[in-house]
Amino acid sequence: MADEEKLPPGWEKRMSRSSGRVYYFNHITNASQWERPSGGSTVGGSSKNGQGEPAKVRCSHLLVKHSQSRRPSSWRQEKITRSKEEALELINGYIQKIKSGEEDFESLASQFSDCSSAKARGDLGPFSRGQMQKPFEDASFALRTGEMSGPVFTDSGIHIILRTE
């Protein structure tokens, strides 16, 4: 009765209008997938925080800032004037390139991220809850290792997050 088991936090079951198949959508990370996500009811382990999630995660990200970002400047551009909508178009384009295999996450992050972590191919290193803006933190902890988010909106701009550990 795997289908009756509780889904991991943020995940919901949906029906594809185009294919008529069931898929799973994470409203925290905006990720979607055909396979049922695992890990909904595991708790414990020395690296866990008692709520079934690791005490720390490691993520890389690609940030696209826009004119409404809290600091609309970056190492790439002194004054960022693009709209939020233009930033989202860029993010969605990067996601498509990564998913199609045309580009890899790390090379896009190093070329186009408005965060100084671009110099480390987007790597932010390990972090625990309380260290990042809440939407970024929630998305990072909801991802499984190796999983990439959809667009994640914070005061800094719009991110694509790749959980690496």
Swiss-Prot record:
Phosphorylation at Ser-73 by DAPK1 results in inhibition of its catalytic activity, nuclear localization, and its ability to induce centrosome amplification, chromosome instability and cell transformation. Ser-73 is dephosphorylated upon IL33-stimulation of dendritic cells. Disruption phenotype: Animals display more and larger germinal centers. In response to intranasal administration of IL33, lung inflammation is reduced compared to wild-type and is associated with low infiltration by inflammatory cells, especially granulocytes, a severe reduction in Th2-type cytokine secretion, including Il4, Il5 and Il13 in bronchial alveolar fluids, and reduced up-regulation of Il6, Csf3, Cxcl2 and Ccl5 mRNAs. In addition, the increase in IRAK3/IRAK-M protein levels in infiltrated inflammatory cells is impaired. It is found in: Nucleus; Nucleus speckle; Cytoplasm. GO terms for cellular component: cytosol; glutamatergic synapse; midbody; nuclear speck; nucleus; postsynapse. Residues 5-39 form the WW domain. SUPFAM superfamilies: FKBP-like, WW domain. Residues 54-165 form the PpiC domain. The modification N6-acetyllysine is found at K48. It comes from the Eukaryota. Its main location: nucleus. The modification Phosphoserine is found at S73, S110. InterPro entries: PPIase_dom_sf, PPIase_Pin1, PPIase_PpiC, PPIase_PpiC_CS, WW_dom, WW_dom_sf. It holds the Pfam family Rotamase. Residues 33-56 are annotated as: Disordered. Its EC number is 5.2.1.8. Expressed in dendritic cells (at protein level). Keywords: Acetylation, Cell cycle, Cytoplasm, Isomerase, Nucleus, Phosphoprotein, Rotamase. One of its GO terms (molecular function) is peptidyl-prolyl cis-trans isomerase activity. Interacts with STIL. Interacts with KIF20B. Interacts with NEK6. Interacts (via WW domain) with PRKX. Interacts with BTK. Interacts (via PpiC domain) with DAPK1. Interacts with the phosphorylated form of RAF1. Interacts (via WW domain) with ATCAY; upon NGF stimulation. Interacts with PML. Interacts with BCL6. Interacts with FBXW7, disrupting FBXW7 dimerization and promoting FBXW7 autoubiquitination and degradation. Directly interacts with RBBP8/CtIP; this interaction depends upon RBBP8 phosphorylation. Peptidyl-prolyl cis/trans isomerase (PPIase) that binds to and isomerizes specific phosphorylated Ser/Thr-Pro (pSer/Thr-Pro) motifs. By inducing conformational changes in a subset of phosphorylated proteins, acts as a molecular switch in multiple cellular processes. Displays a preference for an acidic residue N-terminal to the isomerized proline bond. Regulates mitosis presumably by interacting with NIMA and attenuating its mitosis-promoting activity. Down-regulates kinase activity of BTK. This is Peptidyl-prolyl cis-trans isomerase NIMA-interacting 1.
